[in-house]
Amino acid sequence: MEVKGEIYRVAGPVVTAIGLDAKMYDLCKVGNEGLMGEVIQIVGDKTIIQVYEETGGVRPGEPCVTTGMSLAVELGPGLLSSIYDGVQRPLHVLLERTGGFIGRGVTADGLDHKKLWEFKPVVKKGDRVIGGDVIGVVQETVNIEHKIMVRPDISGTVADIKSGSFTVVDTICTLTDGTELQMMQRWPVRKPRPVKRKLTPEKPLVTGQRILDGLFPVAKGGTAAIPGPFGSGKTVTQQQLSKWSDTEIVVYIGCGERGNEMADVLWEFPELEDPQTGRPLMERTILVANTSNMPVAAREASVYTGMTLAEYFRDMGYDVSLMADSTSRWAEAMREISSRLEEMPGEEGYPAYLSARLAEFYERAGVAETLCGEKGSITAIGAVSPPGGDFSEPVTQNTLRIVKVFWALDAKLSQKRHFPAINWLNSYSLYKEDLNDWFTENVAPDYVPMRERAMDMLQTESELQEIVQLVGSDALPEEQQLLLEITRMIREIFLQQNAFHPIDTYSPFEKQYKIMKAIMKWGDAAMDALKSGVLSSEILKMQSKDELPKVKFEEDFEGSLNAVLAKMDKEFAALGGK
């Protein structure tokens, strides 16, 4: 039911209205142009609304109407391959209506209400259905079967169910109590979709990035943060995860970042093949674009919109990865709204509820047994952009308290052109112990001990570097000089990865394991040769050592690696004979 009031005060994106009989988080139409807004505070007869569009020119006395509904998204066939703004308006529809720049007060349906979809029922007349049950399927893309579910708050007995081509708003099923079900359902973005129970993550998210999979794995259904200063590679890392992670669905939220970065995704994804299915990556992707030049308040909506879309596909039993780039921009939007509301500021001006909002977002991730008995997951990966790369600032610190994987990007590494610029000494993963059994069974029995050994070597290298900077590497014992060479190989061959190289951009587990195994084999053989009296200068002259870095770029990886390993054995045999 619509209730009409009038605007009392305007302060940027925050509008105060009087005479509105509204409740918290009601959706409102503000001003003569009907700008979209949401009730965020009610004080006596004054209703405070955050507006998701530019409020220039809005003045006191203009009408303000509450719709009686919360901000909700449309869920159904047609979501995949779409690009939305923060409040689920399809950008291609807005382009047709208003041109290159989004006009004010423009509304657009999240799904195409005219497109026909082939619906195949999986229940029959007389079947009892409850919230979350699948009543039929639609083949949305070649690989994704879109399951049409009963809304979580509806249950009953099927009186009639249809089969054939329908739009998302056509009635496809009627229950005995008269409830009509469509392929589309609306769901409030701030309300988490219910599940039967949460489960413990047991499998890793395979990203194809060696430093992430090898040293700091994230579980499917886990949470991770990528903090880093400007230019250290947050967006490229996020895009790599979107491209190559082994989930069925990817939701990419560009929250307050540059528009060009979203344009990159739109150019690249249709051209790239999903390594699991061989289909274009765009077919499994939903983009929520809320770029830096779009209204500040809509950044908050974009994060919740993206998470609700991810939960919907999780409820079908799919594994979803959600990328939020960047949560810092969302926090800055909260800070701006909070200051407009004249709330007491917390640390660095951020609102006192910053940590609660971040926790609310990340807690919606996880592995779950859905209402229809399927097992689905959401892996949430948030980029954090601390000013000046200062990890002690509130957004980074509050995120660290919540997430279980921390991939710390380092400006010094990026300046040395070491990419991904993830600092292996500052980063960590709390899923390592949970995933060790999976790695032992599915990769190799010696994978976990080899990984730990590599980490110990890198740790020792950082301690030796202090001495090297003072007196040079020649002052070290030969054994330690050799250790520095092995760790250099680990860094340059294993940890460095070229995101723009057609072969090196994606590295499957088997390839990762064989590269690390080859480095360790060279290291062990070199140490043995040193102990048998061979000079380190002789060992470092070996050709196979210089050829090993090229192997990861070769299309015939197996053949190239075997050739280098054979040469390595030959050279060490020749050294031993001296």
Curated annotation (Swiss-Prot):
Q: Which reaction does this chain catalyze?
A: ATP + H2O + 4 H(+)(in) = ADP + phosphate + 5 H(+)(out)
Which branch of life, at top level?
Archaea
Q: Which cysteines are joined by disulfide bonds?
A: none
Q: Does the keyword Transport apply?
A: yes
- Chain sites annotated for binding ATP: G228, P229, F230, G231, S232, G233, K234, T235
* Modes of activity regulation: ATP hydrolysis stimulated by sulfite, ethanol, glycerol, magnesium and zinc ions, inhibited by diethylstilbestrol (DES) and less well by N,N-dicyclohexylcarbodiimide (DCCD).
User: Which GO molecular function annotation, any one, does this entry have?
Assistant: proton-transporting ATP synthase activity, rotational mechanism
Q: How does activity depend on pH?
A: Optimum pH is 5.2 for ATP hydrolysis.
Q: Which GO terms describe its biological process?
A: proton motive force-driven plasma membrane ATP synthesis
Keyword vocabulary terms for this entry: ATP synthesis, ATP-binding, Cell membrane, Hydrogen ion transport, Ion transport, Membrane, Nucleotide-binding, Translocase, Transport
Q: Which InterPro entries match?
A: ATP-synt_VA_C (IPR055190), ATP-synth_a_Xtn (IPR031686), ATP_synth_asu-like_sf (IPR023366), ATP_synth_asu_arc (IPR005726), ATPase_a/bsu_AS (IPR020003), ATPase_F1/V1/A1_a/bsu_N (IPR004100), ATPase_F1/V1/A1_a/bsu_N_sf (IPR036121), ATPase_F1/V1/A1_a/bsu_nucl-bd (IPR000194)
Q: What is its main location?
A: membrane
EC numbers on record: 7.1.2.2
One Gene Ontology cellular component annotation held by this UniProt entry: plasma membrane
Q: What membrane topology does the UniProt entry give?
A: Peripheral membrane protein
Question: What are the subcellular locations of this protein?
Answer: Cell membrane
| SUPFAM superfamilies, per database record | C-terminal domain of alpha and beta subunits of F1 ATP synthase, N-terminal domain of alpha and beta subunits of F1 ATP synthase, P-loop containing nucleoside triphosphate hydrolases
What family does the Swiss-Prot or TrEMBL record give for this protein? Belongs to the ATPase alpha/beta chains family.
Complex formation: Has multiple subunits with at least A(3), B(3), C, D, E, F, G, I and proteolipid K(x).
The miscellaneous annotation reads:
This organism has both a Na(+)-translocating F1F0 ATP synthase and this H(+)-translocating A1A0 ATP synthase.
Q: What does this protein do?
A: Component of the A-type ATP synthase that produces ATP from ADP in the presence of a proton gradient across the membrane. The A chain is the catalytic subunit.
Identify this protein by name: A-type ATP synthase subunit A
Give the species: Methanosarcina mazei (strain ATCC BAA-159 / DSM 3647 / Goe1 / Go1 / JCM 11833 / OCM 88)
